[in-house]
């Protein structure tokens, strides 16, 4: 259908809006909150039953599918990113909150991806405005070790640093190195006495603050309960 790109974006917005009720049920049941990052692309694909008589599945394959996965990998929870082709096919009914250039693997030229905040027309679905981030300064930084995650491969925890500011699902880290923008990190968190709290935090570099000394912002994509408890404790202590 000609309006497939528009319906896909509308579906993505509805999914994000539905996360409020999903997480409300999770809280009532004692489960952790979850978040979605959604990537959308438009292009030609091969679709159908693929396999043999022993094993067969209905699948979608092709370069457009691979690029969609790459676009999704740049998101953090709550975001919807679309490609230029999807933007062009949707027309001017989209609310675009931001755009950035990326260089995914397997692509020869930089691509512009767009963050969707809503869709008008017959759909009239919009995400709420983003809340202003409230940062809390820490008197004493929390030590961390981190490494860059290259898709499914994780290296050794080799880079040291310290968390100097905390916000909801975000931290500011000062370190000896400056990871690339949008790099995925695995982080080990320590208390002020250098006792390990967790070595299983994951986050994405969402902004560079300084090159010398290196400082950057990380948006958490996975936060174990023990790490969340620690950060919430320091956040609450700073507010009090």
Task: Report each predicted region and the residues it spans.
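Alpha-helical scaffold within the catalytic cores of cyclic-nucleotide enzymes
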Residues: 1-38, 42, 63-64, 68-76, ...
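A short glycine-enriched loop-to-beta-strand structural element that forms part of the catalytic core
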Residues: 32-48, 199-207
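A residue-level detector for short acidic-glycine micro-motifs
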Residues: 73, 165, 205-209, 222
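Cytosolic regulatory/linker segments at or just downstream of nucleotide-handling modules
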Residues: 77-149
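C-terminal output/interaction extensions
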Residues: 124, 128-134, 212-240
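Short strand-loop-strand
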Residues: 148-182, 186-189, 215-217
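Short coil-to-beta-strand transition motifs
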Residues: 155-158, 192-202
């Amino acid at each position: 259908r000609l309006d497939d790109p528009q319906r896909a974006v509308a579906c993505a917005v509805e999914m994000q809006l539905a996360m409020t009720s999903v997480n409300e049920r999770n809280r009532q049941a004692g489960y952790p909150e979850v978040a979605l990052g959604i990537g959308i692309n438009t292009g030609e694909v091969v679709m159908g039953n693929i396999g043999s008589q022993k094993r067969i599945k209905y699948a979608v394959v092709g370069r457009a599918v691979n690029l969609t996965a790459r676009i999704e990998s740049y998101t953090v929870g709550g975001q919807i990113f679309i490609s230029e082709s999807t933007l062009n096919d949707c027309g001017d009914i989209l609310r675009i909150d931001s755009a950035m250039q990326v260089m995914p693997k397997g692509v020869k030229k930089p691509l512009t991806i767009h963050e969707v905040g809503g869709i008008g027309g017959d759909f009239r679905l919009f995400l709420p405005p983003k809340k202003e981030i409230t940062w809390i300064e820490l008197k004493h930084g929390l030590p961390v070790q981190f490494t860059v995650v290259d898709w499914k491969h994780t290296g050794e925890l080799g880079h040291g640093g310290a968390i100097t500011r905390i916000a909801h699902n975000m931290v500011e880290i000062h370190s000896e190195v400056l990871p690339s923008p949008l790099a995925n990190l695995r982080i080990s968190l320590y208390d002020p006495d250098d006792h390990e709290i967790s070595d299983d935090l994951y986050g994405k570099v969402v902004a560079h603050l300084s090159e010398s000394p290196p400082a950057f912002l990380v948006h958490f994509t996975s936060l174990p309960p023990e790490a969340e408890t620690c950060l919430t404790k320091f956040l609450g202590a700073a507010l009090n």
